[in-house]
Every structure is written in C-alpha cells, then in structure tokens.
UniProtKB/Swiss-Prot annotation:
Family: Belongs to the PlsY family.
Function: Catalyzes the transfer of an acyl group from acyl-phosphate (acyl-PO(4)) to glycerol-3-phosphate (G3P) to form lysophosphatidic acid (LPA). This enzyme utilizes acyl-phosphate as fatty acyl donor, but not acyl-CoA or acyl-ACP.
Chief localization: membrane
Source organism: Neisseria gonorrhoeae (strain ATCC 700825 / FA 1090)
Coiled coil: none
UniProt topology in membrane: Multi-pass membrane protein
Stated name of the protein: Glycerol-3-phosphate acyltransferase
Pathway recorded for this protein: Lipid metabolism; phospholipid metabolism
Keyword annotations: Cell inner membrane, Cell membrane, Lipid biosynthesis, Lipid metabolism, Membrane, Phospholipid biosynthesis, Phospholipid metabolism, Transferase, Transmembrane, Transmembrane helix
E.C. number(s) listed in UniProt: 2.3.1.275
Length: 200
C-alpha cells in the first residue's frame, strides 16, 4: 500500500540539487552554466569555492542516505517490501539525475549513489569509497575514479547485500551513473578529461 508513496517521496528527496542550492546560498553562478555544466561537487569545485563543493558533496550523499534509511526504518511499520526498498534506492538517484524542482537537469549521481549504498550496505559503500579515493589520489581525475568505483559496486553488492532486489538495484544504479558519464568516457579516451580542481 505504501510502496508507491515511498518511492515518490524518495524521488522528491533526490530532486534536491545541492549544487544549485549551495551555489545560490553563496551567491555563486549556477553550476549548470559553467565548467562541465554538471550540477555536482566536482564542477562546483571548479569555481574555486572549496567549502561550497564540500557542502554539495555532503548534501548530495546525505539525501541518498536519508531517503533509503528512512524507508528502511519505516519498512516494518509501513509494510514495505525489500523490492520497494530497492525501488526507493533507485528513485533517489533518478531524482538527482532528473530533478523535478530544477527542470529535470541534474547531476551524474556519484555522491548520491554513495549515500544510497551506505544505507543499503555500509560494506559495499566502503569498498566503493576506498576505490574512489585510491583512484582519485593516484590519477587526480574524478571521473575516472567514479567510473572504476561505480563498476565495482555491483560486484561488491554480490558479497555484502542480503537481498537480490537490492543487488539488481545497485546494478541499475551503476548503469545509470556510467551512462551519465558518457562524455567523460569519451574525454578519457581522447586524453582530454580535466583533473580535480582544474578549471575548464
């Protein structure tokens, strides 16, 4: 009965674009109008405002965490199925990528995906975060780190997630994040991808 409303609420939470919200708070340009045009922490960092970028990262991750954690806490009282939790997880990411509050022009979903994974399986999230950190510090390319960590997510989920529907949700999340990085993949192939903090 509450499965569909739970998914809808998760989508709305995911639709809160912290890159845009934080930028407006600090009187900065809309991140969709400069750099890569992506409303995410990496692009906000290109503005030179490290605090704004950090808040964007935390906000985007937190909304994924809160959306799924809220559903998990209320799972028994509301009679939500495990499949509904999986759908809630996916909906939070879809909201971030296609936010109803911001003209359906959202980000690439890396931070939000991490928050979602943290709520579903802390171990899976930890594996992905460690991979991202190693790649980011090693190569200084955020998109490369994100792509490798994203690819590893479904594999880690196979070992750490208790429900098949959650594993499939993680796979779907990984596919969406990879698809949103199509331009980054092409730039990596051409050797034109910018490094962390580098202005375009």
């Amino acid at each position: 009965m509450f499965n569909i409303p739970a998914v809808a609420v998760s989508y709305l939470i995911g639709s809160l674009s912290f890159a845009v919200i934080v930028s407006k708070y600090y009187g900065m340009d809309d991140p969709r109008t400069y750099g890569s045009g992506n409303p995410g922490a990496t692009n906000v960092l290109r503005s030179g405002k490290k605090k704004a970028a950090a808040l964007t990262l935390l906000g985007d991750a937190a909304k994924g965490l809160v959306a799924v954690l809220l559903a998990r806490v209320l799972q028994e009282p509301l009679g939500l199925s495990d499949s509904a939790i999986a759908a809630v997880a996916l909906a939070a990411l879809v909201g971030h990528m296609w936010p109803v509050f911001f003209g359906f022009k959202g980000g690439k979903g890396v931070a939000t995906a991490l928050g979602v994974l943290l709520a579903l399986s802390p171990a899976t999230a930890l594996v992905c975060a460690l991979i991202w950190l190693v790649m980011a510090f090693g190569f200084k390319v955020s998109s490369l780190a994100a792509l490798v960590a994203t690819t590893a997510a479904p594999l880690a989920a196979l070992f750490f997630m208790p429900h098949t529907s959650w594993i499939f949700a993680t796979l779907a999340i990984a596919i969406l994040v990879l698809l949103r990085h199509k331009s980054n993949i092409l730039n990596l192939i051409k050797g034109k991808e910018s490094k962390i903090g580098e202005k375009r």
